[in-house]
Amino acid sequence: MLLSKYFLPVLKEEPSEAQVTSHKLMLRSGMIRQQAAGIYTWLPLGLKVLKNIENIVRLNMNKAGALEVLMPCIQPAHLWMESGRFDNYGKEMLKFQDRHDNTLLFGPTNEDMITDIFRHNIKSYKDLPKNLYHIQWKFRDEIRPRFGVMRGREFLMKDAYSFDINEENAVKTYNQMYKAYINAFRDLGVFAIPVIADNGPIGGNLSHEFHIIAETGESTIYYDKKFKTLKDNPDIDVEEIKSWYAAAEEKYEVNKLPISEQEITSSKGIEVGHIFYIGSKYSVNMNALINDEYGKLTPIEMSSYGIGISRLVAAIIEANCDEKGIIWPSSVAPFKVSLINLNIHDSKCVELAEMAYKELSDKNIEVLYDDTEARPGSKFATHDLIGSPHQIIIGPKKAANNIVALKDRKSGVIEDIEVGSLMSVL
């Protein structure tokens, strides 16, 4: 992509309305723009990141055997009345009437609707297990939306729902999804800690939250110091990780620790995923019954699995940034390479830049080619801000000798590379 043809409305100054780093950087780098309190338009750069995260999550759900569906944003209120949640959910639920006076709502979650789909289409234990997921926009009318997309009113979620004949099988499915979550966050290039947690309004009695460590996190989590080894050794077996202690603040009890208090550390975390074993709460209330192997009608056992796709964008930035801007993990970066031509009027610079651009594009490496008239200092500031993992810098002096500079955004290390060797280094 040529920067001269791209839509990248960067801001030089910090926006006064932004409180946390991710919100500031998302506005400054031209990823989003606010349309109303807690509601944002995703501009090209931000949407690329959002789609990259979405695709990685989708891949891991598919690997876990989950099947993708797409449920509507707008839900009939009678399903929520039937499940018993309509009056209990509170003012966060946006409700309205259509022209026929039917009460509808903008779905904040989908347990009720997926239970309705299940009960009308699956009747026998022979059709189990089933695990269905969708990626859809949700709305919760937060009383005080803040921190940009971290706590907005409109947000993109991946929600999965599993159905099993009994608790034993349901827990097996839950454990499979736990592993899928660990793998998904690894693939996203983030360090997420699974902690024992409360189920909240969803219900149920088995639950884990997944937190990314960040100083701006709203929750305090307590965890075994072994988790810190995940940063340097991401290939640790998931079963081993599952045996390590980690708990949300409301579940942390010093006198009931399975390991010594000295082995525990605490950090602020941003919750980016939550999985629940719900049991038969919804199936009982909504009469979602199936025939078991003895022909007896029995309520289905359910679990729910959520990942905040749009929130992840902000959380990843909080954990991967410096004073200059964003430092994207390669897996989610909107562009893997920023190609910076410092003098677009120098024929040799143009020759090397176009050569590199073609080679990168031919290898399906996403590259943003800065072919603008901006000054070198402005170009460096822009590309440090948007956070491409690698920068190829082409200036007249080195270009004369077929040399380009390759900068690693995370370490800041710059090395001179002969242009013909560029692809082997990248």
UniProtKB/Swiss-Prot annotation:
The keyword Iron-sulfur does not apply. The keyword Nucleotide-binding applies. Its EC number is 6.1.1.15. It comes from the Bacteria. Its main location: cytoplasm. Coiled coil: none annotated. It is found in: Cytoplasm. GO terms for molecular function: ATP binding; proline-tRNA ligase activity. It catalyses: tRNA(Pro) + L-proline + ATP = L-prolyl-tRNA(Pro) + AMP + diphosphate. GO terms for biological process: prolyl-tRNA aminoacylation. One of its GO terms (cellular component) is cytosol. Pfam families: HGTP_anticodon, tRNA-synt_2b. InterPro entries: aa-tRNA-synt_IIb, aa-tRNA-synth_II, aa-tRNA-synth_II/BPL/LPL, Anticodon-bd, Anticodon-bd_dom_sf, Pro-tRNA-ligase_IIa, Pro-tRNA-synth_IIa_bac-type, Pro-tRNA_synthetase. Keywords: Aminoacyl-tRNA synthetase, ATP-binding, Cytoplasm, Ligase, Nucleotide-binding, Protein biosynthesis. Catalyzes the attachment of proline to tRNA(Pro) in a two-step reaction: proline is first activated by ATP to form Pro-AMP and then transferred to the acceptor end of tRNA(Pro). Homodimer. Belongs to the class-II aminoacyl-tRNA synthetase family. ProS type 2 subfamily. PANTHER family: MITOCHONDRIAL RIBOSOME PROTEIN L39/PROLYL-TRNA LIGASE FAMILY MEMBER, PROLINE--TRNA LIGASE. This is Proline--tRNA ligase. It comes from Rickettsia peacockii (strain Rustic). The gene is proS.
